[in-house]
A protein has these predicted regions:
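Short alpha-helical packing/oligomerization segments
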Residues: 83-118
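Terminal transmembrane helical module of multi-pass membrane proteins
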Residues: 121-152
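Hydrophobic transmembrane helix segments
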Residues: 20-67, 86
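Canonical alpha-helical transmembrane segments
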Residues: 61-81, 117-123
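Alpha-helical transmembrane segments
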Residues: 11-27, 89-92, 140
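Juxtamembrane "helix-exit" motif on the non-cytosolic side of transmembrane helices
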Residues: 30-45, 95-104, 146-152
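Membrane-interfacial loop-to-transmembrane alpha-helix junctions, especially the N-terminal start
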Residues: 77-89, 131-135
Length: 152
């Protein structure tokens, strides 16, 4: 009986807490690093005209770089719970970038986000990833919508 409770704790309860908590910390770190990059570009390349900073381009390149980093991380032997927790950062930035790219066209933002989620679910299924990756994907989607969706 004790072994069953221990297994339940490590396989279900722990991921339910670690993924959103650790994921939020990683997502926050990703946002702070984006802010650092943005401020660096503004300070060194656009000191007299801060509104000329190509924020969209910086955000898109950064999101792509994070996705490439995450794909490299997937090839390591790091545990699934750490990989799924780290997934929140790159995917969160990617969702936010997508939503902001279609900020004035909410229907298009929804359509592209649904396509990204569908591709993500397909890839997770194809590579037989455990449920914690799906949980991380859905958690990230909800967080990104709250953070990036246009206010009414």
């Amino acid at each position: 009986m004790c072994e069953m409770k221990k297994n339940y704790f490590y396989s279900i309860l722990l991921p339910l807490v670690i993924i959103p908590t650790g994921g939020l910390l990683i997502l926050g770190t990703c946002y702070l690093f984006y802010l650092f990059i943005y401020n660096f570009v503004e300070f060194w390349f656009f000191p007299t005209n801060p509104t000329a900073v190509p924020a969209d381009m910086i955000r898109r390149v950064y999101a792509l770089a994070l996705l490439i980093f995450y794909l490299a991380l997937l090839r390591t032997k790091i545990s699934d719970i750490i990989q799924s927790t780290v997934l929140v950062g790159p995917i969160g930035i990617f969702f936010t970038t997508t939503i902001l790219a279609f900020y004035e066209k909410p229907v298009m933002a929804i359509a592209v986000t649904v396509v990204i989620v569908a591709v993500g679910i397909f890839l997770l299924y194809k590579y037989k990833k455990p449920w914690i990756y799906y949980y991380a994907l859905v958690t990230t989607l909800l967080i990104s919508i709250v953070l990036a969706w246009p206010e009414a």
